[in-house]
Amino acid sequence: MSHPAKVETDAAYPLPGHMRAWVLGDPGQLSLVDKPIPMPGRAEVLVHIDAVAICATDLEIIHHGAPALIGGGEPFNKMFTPGHEYMGTVAGLGPGVDEYRVGQRVSVEVHAGCGQCKRCREGMYTACLNYGLNYGDVDKGHRANGFTTDGGFAEYAVNNINTLIAIPDSMSDAEATLVVTAGTAMYGLTELGGLVAGEGVAVLGPGPIGLLGVAVAKALGASPVVLTGTRDNRLQIGRALGADHVINVRSEDAVEAVRRITAGKGLDYVLECSGAPDAVDQAARMLNRGGRICLAAFPHQPVSIDVAYIVRNNIYLYGIRGEGKSAAHRAEALMSQKRFDATKIHTHTFGLHELPTALRYAREHIDDAIKVVVTTRNTELARAAVPADDKSMHGNTKVSDG
């Protein structure tokens, strides 16, 4: 395959003419197709995607569109490839790029801000004021892999150098896909929440962000760390990741338990990852005066909040989206130092051609799936084993709402 003259490649990592990629058609419909391999421009690299984890937001995009925004509108029937929690190997360097080398393993952040708006200048590029306003011109405005540009359910993707995080060979592919998840928790706990060692933290909801929130909080010296949820097996994973106390809210009142654990003083910080309708009110009552609540979940029902209680007790309430202020780099540092084992939340692995099954496992929590990872490392085997006209590979696949 010929490449633009200023794109640096390496014979040790040859590029084929096309790649396999899942593209979104109508809502809930994905097709595995051949697409041209994109070429990196200035300040960009081409990454061969080795593994991609499935996030609940991917499921929302596939079925409902938002928060993806392609060409100024919904992402359906635009040959758009979703997926945003991925890692891989650098396969090509755009003009002038010398920060990375071909063959280097990297984890990839989602967001590359415009770099010009107020929020980007503050380092809050996940809150870029130009999000989605590039309308297909990736040289302008905010770029978000799997949201406003093609993402990771493919063999290759182009990424801005500011979104790359170098990872050591000691970190597995699956673990590297979790850097962004841990970075999201890190962003909420430290950059926005100001968590310092010795402060007490509760995490509500043992999903991926919640479980890694426990791990990050403990690694940063929080004490005590309390995890609440409804599934005992997930609570035990949380304990293994550093929770000092776990509370099953089906059998115990979480607020009363926290008050008992803290001798009535309350905690300093709550990371709310459950999305339950009463979670914010419960979080407020777990805190001492001046405590902070970080909202990291998307409730599917209206939420009732006792604002007067929050005002009287000087409680701070804020939301996070993604992994701003380079928090993912700090999360990767903790993971590289083996301060916690993020792979405890990795439960299932599928091949790229099995993406619809992987999505179903993630959506329906089959076999208590927590983090489902899709790998491209067996793609060549799949190509050899499946005829080119096999509809399971090239045809439309309806991703059922289950």
Predicted features along the sequence, with ranges:
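Short N-terminal strand-loop motif that marks the start
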Residues: 1-87, 151, 155, 159, ...
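C-terminal hydrophobic helical "lid"/dimerization subdomain
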Residues: 2-17, 277, 281-285, 326-402
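NAD(P)H dinucleotide-binding glycine-rich loop of Rossmann-like/cofactor-binding domains
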Residues: 37, 73-77, 84, 114-204, ...
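Glycine-rich beta-strand-centered segment in the early N-terminal region that forms part
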Residues: 38-52, 67-121, 126, 168-170
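Mid-domain Rossmann-like dinucleotide-binding core that forms the NAD(H)/NADP(H) cofactor-binding site
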Residues: 162-164, 168-252, 256
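Glycine-rich cofactor phosphate-binding loops and adjacent beta1-alpha1 units
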Residues: 192-197, 220, 236-316, 356, ...
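Rossmann-fold dehydrogenase core element
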Residues: 292-294, 305-344
